[in-house]
Design a protein with these regions (language model features):
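Active-site beta-strand/loop signature of hydrolases that rely on acidic residues for catalysis
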Residues: 1-4, 35-60, 122, 132-136, ...
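Short, solvent-exposed loop/turn segments at secondary-structure junctions
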Residues: 5-8, 55-56, 85-86, 100-103, ...
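Charged helix-capping and loop-helix junction motifs
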Residues: 62-66, 147-153
Length: 246
């Protein structure tokens, strides 16, 4: 599952971006309750990629939200990568919670005029028979996204079994998505899954992409509006030589 959780902030109307803007810098009592709901959902999955997760700052009550979700949902393994820090106020991150033990994690800064975007590459299994998972949150501008997806393509160029997930901030048939799929052999099993805004979805900017060796059994958007995005869920069948260990 891939989910942009907006630092645990629930948003149900556009006007709340203004009226609830203080929640992006200050703690609020509802945040942990919302995270508990997200943890309950996440507990149904084996691998979860998180975007806009806070790594422990003033606004989150100094709670590392990736760790919190992992513990609440019963995940054994977790990791966060902080891409942008605003003093003690916010530590914007991407995160992984997993039932399987990673064999290697590497953090990458993504190119772009404005810093603060990253990619987390996670390897599972044995060399030569491994699954590579990449969790990303891309820039708002198209030029930066094109650069960032070129970087992602180079990051996975030699890997046969790959899953890329995250908030790409672009649609299925956008030029930047066409570039990535053309460069890598990744595919999107189902196009135009609408995830944003969560209360009236009209844009498909959250994606899970796979290489042909990863067989997709099911993919859907889940109607769990605990953020301003909806989560994307996918069930996959891995090649027989790929073994994930807990």
């Amino acid at each position: 599952m891939s989910y942009n959780i907006q630092a645990g902030i629930s948003t149900t109307h556009f006007h709340q971006y203004l009226t609830h803007s203080w929640k992006h810098v200050l703690p609020d009592a509802e945040r942990l309750t919302n995270l508990d709901s997200i943890a309950c959902l996440a507990s149904n999955f084996d691998l979860v990629g998180l975007q806009e997760v806070d790594a422990g700052s003033l606004r989150s009550g100094f709670v590392n939200q990736t760790e919190y979700l992992a513990l609440k949902a019963g995940f054994t393994h977790w990791h966060h990568q902080t891409n942008r820090t605003i003093g003690n106020v916010a530590r914007q991150s991407i995160g992984l919670v997993s039932r399987f033990r990673p064999t290697l994690l590497t953090e990458h800064k993504l190119p772009g005029r404005i810093p603060g975007r990253g990619a987390l590459r996670v390897e599972f299994g044995s060399p030569g028979a491994q699954l590579v998972l990449v969790i990303i949150h891309l820039a708002l501008g198209r030029r930066a996204r094109l650069q960032q997806l070129k970087f992602i393509g180079e990051l996975i160029t030699d890997d046969p079994n790959v899953i890329v997930m995250g908030d790409l901030n672009c649609r299925s048939r956008s030029p930047e998505m066409d570039q990535l799929l053309g460069d890598t052999g990744l595919c999107e099993p189902t196009h135009d899954l609408l995830t944003f805004p969560s209360w009236r979805p009209s844009r498909n900017i959250d994606h899970i992409l796979v290489t042909p060796s990863v067989k997709v059994e099911r993919v859907s958007v889940l109607n769990y509006p605990f953020s301003d995005h909806l989560p994307v869920a996918m069930d996959v069948l891995l090649p027989g030589n790929v073994t994930l260990r807990s």
